[in-house]
Amino acid sequence: MKIDFIDSIEKITKEDWEAVLSSKYPFLKYEFLKALEVTNCVSPEQGWTPLHLIASENKTIMAIMPLYIKTDSQGEFIFDWSWADAYYRNGLNYYPKLVSSIPFTPASGPRILITDETRSREVIQEISKALKQITEESDFSSVHILLASRDEI
């Protein structure tokens, strides 16, 4: 399985993204996430840099995970400023961190979109390895999966 990280939703076709989206959850729709990007609502200047995860096998997309590099905690609806302060007091950087979330949306929902549920355990294991690797290589403090749906917890 190959894991790639893309810095814009436009690096994948709408058809490929929507083929993986099995629910009608509106905040994961290609058009919604693209609109956030093209209007610069999510951008490095806003503290939300897209870095979406794409898992594929034989050039077929198996899974997608919306991801963002966060340089602050604005727009997450997870109030972790005390965590950031604790990191700072101990000489550590809390930012940048890697976040799977829907920007500015305090609604729970799917965060890992998988095409073949019979392989979900395997896919999640590969995604976990890739997230650990990119966190270490890119010096992110941590990975956060925010407001995931109940069945993903």
Residue ranges and their predicted role:
Residues M1-I153:
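N-acyltransferase acceptor-side catalytic subdomain
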